[in-house]
């Protein structure tokens, strides 16, 4: 079996949470950290090296640069400024972070890298689209974390509401990873059964609205309380990396380039995708209610309007 190499660009809280989770899963034989801040880069490498003896697989953790990426299989990008406390939206990060992403994309392209890239920098759908356009890489090999974490929050909220395990919940959030995202309640299920089977509420729509409100406010509440979110996205993206590198063909909600699905083209947003060694191997278009479709159309338009601001 080929030894795998995973690189991290941006050694902030999100990036290092991803790498630590990846190491805990024994994903690779070598991990490389790239960061413009050498002090932080080396400090995080030292800290992660100390975790190697307790990890399930022996691995090397090194500080490196873009020139070394040619030999790597997988890149995770977490670089960029995070949201500020006080209710800053992800889209408000666009102006500064898009220039950072353009520079990263150029450097990765020049390195000769041929593997798969997973991006979590916000606003993630536009950052992933920017990276795709600047690099010119195959669309299936450029993936945004999209509404992966939103969907995990939805599953958690449903499980908590009905006293079930989140592993038995099948539910998705589509569209922008942001305020215009759409919770797909119409097809949500627990152990194959619709949610109404478990609800005792007289007004089930109100109950669903409360769940939706919870997941929309979750990130803002975490940021207000501790300054940033990173454990949830770190674990979720490490799982995506594992599904890809182990070629499992499992479905997760990530952002991929849309080409006709949901009536949209040339935009990236969260939707269920089959993941394997080629990255996104299939984009799944799930059935939506009229209200959900209208919400997704609005979310797509929000993304398209903001893509123009990226000046690609």
Curated annotation (Swiss-Prot):
Keyword Electron transport applies: no
CDD domains attached to this UniProt entry: HicDH_like (cd05291)
Transmembrane helix found in the keyword field: no
Top-level taxon: Bacteria
Chain positions recorded as substrate binding sites: 83, 90, 122-125, 150-153, 229
Binding sites annotated in the UniProt record for NAD(+): 14, 35, 66, 120-122, 145
EC number: 1.1.1.27
Main location: cytoplasm
Localisation: Cytoplasm
Active site (UniProt): 177 (proton acceptor)
GO cellular component: cytoplasm; membrane
Transmembrane regions: none
One Pfam family here: Ldh_1_C
Name of the top EC class for this enzyme: oxidoreductase
Gene Ontology BP, a term: glycolytic process
Family, similarity comment: Belongs to the LDH/MDH superfamily. LDH family.
Known role: Catalyzes the conversion of lactate to pyruvate.
Subunit structure of this chain's protein: Homotetramer.
NCBIfam families in alphabetical order: L-LDH-NAD
Descriptive protein name: L-lactate dehydrogenase
